């Protein structure tokens, strides 16, 4: 049974290796020819021919007798496998073992066919003498073997993290590699070809340009240094101490402690103007070179070879463009040093010292300050006027400042200050201290001892930022508004009035008729004049003189379309303009006189300010057209 089971397993593996698509055969195998043909398909063609010849030569020795009644057995899968495996044919067993061997043990290769052929006992064994299942070599594909194989494959494919292996050259360290690279670069630079002629020409051109720039710089510095500051000031270099690198004006120095220089010279000659300015340079390294160059340039001047100013101008004119004066020159003109203000010292002659207690000396100083323009007074910074003050507690502290001759002084006669504020205003302050040379302000006395009612004045003021606030000027036309509206009236009155065909109120057409003009007029226009009539107002109040209803010249009226075009420029809605027209139109003939036009313009401006239109124009507005517009109320005596 053990031999049959091993044969069945080998045959099943061979059958699966041929192809899984084939279905189970339904025909019975009744002869040995079918068995040999079926097994011959599995083997190779060359081995099949050789084995077939051997079967023909020795059929009796290799074959075993078949059972007597093979047809009685059932044709199932296992019976077919038994029949195939029991065949002792040499050609049928060899390919079956070769096909089944890789499926059983893929890691260990099967024995070659030559080794099987060389075995003398292999072909003599019968199917029943095949080794048992235990005798077959076991497959090494256990889980431990599989894990071991996977580990070996991973270790072989892994890249070792070794710095020595990654280096291109293990023999050299990084320092040696850098040294070799430098050596190669130096060797290449030494072996490089010589400079071409073009490179040499470029170097020579650069050298020439540098020389030209240096010469121009020296000439410019000499020309600036040679310029004199003023006809009365001598700018000379101090010979007391060269290391100080300071330029002095040779004057009698009577310097103060706050503006005195530490390195100023004392033994100098006197000049009448009595001003000494010490300009010190703190940049020692750069200024030493400049001073040496200036000493070399000034050596021929000291020896007597003096040049005129004309020659200096010609030297500077040779430049293409004269350089602008530097910061040093500008500061020297302003009597200030370049580095620090404290380095300059301002002094006065003892004869020119003024005392504020002596009136004669003070008057002389005032006259000189008024005449002289070089003296610069310190500017005064007045207090800013704060318009938006929402608290009444702090309003009294802010006093208005009035300018007098360009200098601001506090108003000593302001009615807004109280007695306590007058006592505090006498204290010294920065903005109230008068400058020297300005006339003292005259003292003004109050006209009355009563205090002004500031609250009432503030209420009556007109705030331009809030024009909609209620004040007295909103009830009538002011003089400024009246003049502005009269200019518009004068430039537009009488325009297109000759084209009006409606009979107008107050116009005497009999005195103005011209027979020549009537003859030239068309018949349609004459008929319109005869048939048309003005609309009469039944609610007429009798203001004939105000609205010129009785008598008026045609040139003193303005046409309705002209008024419409003027009012349209205000960009008010047409409904609002219609209401304004109805409020002022007393003539009812499509025209307006001067008073009506002025009131209409005033109402347009009031609408632009944001006020609402009244239901009726007050008499105060109409009265303001003829006079100042001030209503005086007389109180009765008690």
Curated annotation (Swiss-Prot):
Annotated GO biological process: adhesion of symbiont to host; cellular response to starvation; filamentous growth; filamentous growth of a population of unicellular organisms in response to biotic stimulus; filamentous growth of a population of unicellular organisms in response to starvation; fungal-type cell wall organization; lipid metabolic process
UniProt biased composition (Polar residues): 27-47, 306-317, 427-440
Biased amino acid composition, Low complexity: 48-60, 414-426
GO CC annotations, alphabetized: cytoplasm; plasma membrane
Keyword Lipid metabolism among record annotations: yes
Keywords in alphabetical order: Lipid metabolism
CDD domains the record matches: EH
Start-end of Basic and acidic residues biased regions: 291-305
Disordered, as annotated region: 15-78, 270-356, 409-440
GO MF entries: calcium ion binding
UniProt key word Ribonucleoprotein: no
PROSITE patterns: EF_HAND_2, EH
Limits of the EH domain: 539-628
InterPro entries, per the entry: EF-hand-dom_pair (IPR011992), EF_hand_dom (IPR002048), EH_dom (IPR000261)
A Pfam family: EH
Highest taxon of the lineage: Eukaryota
EF-hand domain sequence ranges: 572-607
Free-text function comment from the UniProt entry: Positive regulator of phosphatidylinositol 4,5-bisphosphate turnover and negatively regulates signaling through the cell integrity pathway. Involved in rDNA silencing.
Family per similarity comment: Belongs to the IRS4 family.
Name of the protein in its database record: Increased rDNA silencing protein 4
Gene symbol of the encoding locus: IRS4
